[in-house]
């Protein structure tokens, strides 16, 4: 099973692609889709749509995973995340991919085992679970990988 996770944003969208096979979880690819600060919102969202579509074409994942938008005190940030999430959902739908939206609590519980885990604890566990030398950067990438891990564990009943 190939799982692609996205941590959406209009400036930086982290992504991670994992494979769950008989030998466990393996990394296919991870990275960040970034847009220049001078681009308008329309251009940024169009670029994001094209890049997400390319990843879906290239890796043909079984499922697209994202985190449910949580309450954010900064309304502009929340709107930008929602716009990016909508573009990713549209790309997934056009590629006929299953879409799974996880809550922050689900991710924390499955990756760390503690519902009040910090961002640093989640990032550390991503590094350990995937046997990486370093924590993936930027943070958005580690978050996207955590979403993939959480989805896989959820499917296994962990």
UniProtKB/Swiss-Prot annotation:
GO terms for cellular component: cytoplasm; Holliday junction resolvase complex. HAMAP family: RuvC. This is Crossover junction endodeoxyribonuclease RuvC. One of its GO terms (biological process) is DNA repair. It is an enzyme of class 3 (hydrolase). It comes from Dictyoglomus turgidum (strain DSM 6724 / Z-1310). Its main location: cytoplasm. It comes from the Bacteria. Homodimer which binds Holliday junction (HJ) DNA. The HJ becomes 2-fold symmetrical on binding to RuvC with unstacked arms; it has a different conformation from HJ DNA in complex with RuvA. In the full resolvosome a probable DNA-RuvA(4)-RuvB(12)-RuvC(2) complex forms which resolves the HJ. Mg(2+) 1 binds at residues 7, 140. The lineage of its organism: Bacteria, Pseudomonadati, Dictyoglomota, Dictyoglomia, Dictyoglomales. Its EC number is 3.1.21.10. The keyword DNA repair applies. The RuvA-RuvB-RuvC complex processes Holliday junction (HJ) DNA during genetic recombination and DNA repair. Endonuclease that resolves HJ intermediates. Cleaves cruciform DNA by making single-stranded nicks across the HJ at symmetrical positions within the homologous arms, yielding a 5'-phosphate and a 3'-hydroxyl group; requires a central core of homology in the junction. The consensus cleavage sequence is 5'-(A/T)TT(C/G)-3'. Cleavage occurs on the 3'-side of the TT dinucleotide at the point of strand exchange. Keywords: Cytoplasm, DNA damage, DNA recombination, DNA repair, DNA-binding, Endonuclease, Hydrolase, Magnesium, Metal-binding, Nuclease. Binds 2 Mg(2+) ion per subunit. One of its GO terms (molecular function) is magnesium ion binding. The active site is at 7, 67, 140. Its cofactor is Mg(2+). Mg(2+) 2 binds at residue 67.
């Amino acid at each position: 099973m190939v799982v692609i996770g996205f941590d959406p944003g209009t400036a930086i969208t982290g992504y991670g692609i994992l494979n769950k096979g008989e030998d466990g979880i393996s990394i296919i690819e991870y990275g960040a889709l970034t847009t220049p600060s001078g681009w308008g919102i329309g251009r940024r969202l169009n670029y994001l749509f094209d890049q997400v579509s390319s990843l879906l074409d290239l890796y043909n994942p079984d499922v697209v995973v994202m985190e449910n938008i949580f309450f954010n005190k900064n309304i502009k940030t929340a709107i930008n995340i929602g716009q990016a999430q909508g573009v990713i959902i549209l790309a997934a739908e056009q590629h006929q991919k299953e879409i799974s939206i996880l809550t922050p609590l689900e991710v924390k519980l499955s990756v760390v085992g503690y519902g009040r885990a910090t961002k640093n604890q989640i990032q550390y566990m991503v590094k350990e679970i995937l046997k990486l030398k370093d924590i993936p950067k930027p943070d958005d990438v580690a978050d996207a990988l955590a979403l993939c891990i959480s989805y896989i564990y959820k499917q296994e009943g962990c």
